Amino acid sequence: MTAHWKQNQKNLMLFSGRAHPELAEAVAKELDVNVTPMTARDFANGEIYVRFEESVRGSDCFVLQSHTQPLNKWLMEQLLMIDALKRGSAKRITAILPFYPYARQDKKHRGREPISARLIADLMLTAGADRIVSVDLHTDQIQGFFDGPVDHMHAMPILTDHIKENYNLDNICVVSPDAGRVKVAEKWANTLGDAPMAFVHKTRSTEVANQVVANRVVGDVDGKDCVLLDDMIDTGGTIAGAVGVLKKAGAKSVVIACTHGVFSDPARERLSACGAEEVITTDTLPQSTEGWSNLTVLSIAPLLARTINEIFENGSVTTLFEGEA
């Protein structure tokens, strides 16, 4: 059996989709449980079949899926897993989405557009999820899209600990890639010894996806070792451009830090050649450092395991952030 037992009753069960089984195994190791066996396969027409190999009746179930490419396939697989647990009489179902899909579509920019991030929350609820866990949502308002508890976890302590251990904080300047993430940059600056801040002002094209048409630095980065942060990096165009702007403004060096390394082509080429000393990310999405000498991948598994344990024990997830959630 793979469940963790409490008071002679089967309780905690961890389930993994096929997108990133390595992360689920790492979380399971932290929790001292096994990932519950599941049969999953694709039919010839692209439909997905899932079935769990053990009883889930009365269990506290946690369904982990990383939404990497092909994103829509893995999203559908997680929804089917949740539906199967609901129909199998699971007591409580928590959907764990380390990287929340469609998070950038959290509002209408123009008429006749969907609010896709809200739809994802509705789909999770309809499938049978009682709770959602995610890491560093693109915008905080996504927490309100789901009609139930949402645990919004933060990777900042993991990333800042790496900075503290590997860089001299005396000359650090924390840089936000845009004005919208200045609040997050302030938290980073406080954590890194009240470091000075700057941000990159950018103008994004409304017609061409992932294209920045202009940007400039607001703040003094001359001679500074800059930590350029963001929640996610997709094609890397914005961040690579920001590195260039910081270097032109006199930055001594630039380190890039992000929670979600989407890294769609040609991100690897751009970030390898942009002049950044290091690109730091986590494994909320599957990563490979092969052929990418300046990429560092930190594990999110301990954070997810502690979160799962607090939920399972009916504890306080907020305590993981010393009162900041």
Curated annotation (Swiss-Prot):
Mg(2+) 1 binds at H138. Mg(2+) 2 binds at D178. It is found in: Cytoplasm. Keywords: ATP-binding, Cytoplasm, Kinase, Magnesium, Metal-binding, Nucleotide biosynthesis, Nucleotide-binding, Transferase. SMART domains: Pribosyltran_N (SM01400). The keyword Iron does not apply. It catalyses: D-ribose 5-phosphate + ATP = 5-phospho-alpha-D-ribose 1-diphosphate + AMP + H(+). Homohexamer. Belongs to the ribose-phosphate pyrophosphokinase family. Class I subfamily. One of its GO terms (molecular function) is ATP binding. ATP binds at N45, G46, E47, R104, Q105. The active site is at K202. Involved in the biosynthesis of the central metabolite phospho-alpha-D-ribosyl-1-pyrophosphate (PRPP) via the transfer of pyrophosphoryl group from ATP to 1-hydroxyl of ribose-5-phosphate (Rib-5-P). One of its GO terms (cellular component) is ribose phosphate diphosphokinase complex. Its cofactor is Mg(2+). Pathway: Metabolic intermediate biosynthesis; 5-phospho-alpha-D-ribose 1-diphosphate biosynthesis; 5-phospho-alpha-D-ribose 1-diphosphate from D-ribose 5-phosphate (route I): step 1/1. Binds 2 Mg(2+) ions per subunit. InterPro entries: PRib_PP_synth_CS, Pribosyltran_N, PRibTrfase_dom, PRTase-like, Rib-P_diPkinase, Rib-P_diPkinase_bac. It comes from Corynebacterium glutamicum (strain ATCC 13032 / DSM 20300 / JCM 1318 / BCRC 11384 / CCUG 27702 / LMG 3730 / NBRC 12168 / NCIMB 10025 / NRRL B-2784 / 534). Transmembrane segments: none annotated. This is Ribose-phosphate pyrophosphokinase. One of its GO terms (biological process) is ribonucleoside monophosphate biosynthetic process. Its EC number is 2.7.6.1. D-ribose 5-phosphate binds at R204, D230, D234, T235, G236, G237, T238. The lineage of its organism: Bacteria, Bacillati, Actinomycetota, Actinomycetes, Mycobacteriales. CDD domains: PRTases_typeI. Pfam families: Pribosyl_synth, Pribosyltran_N.
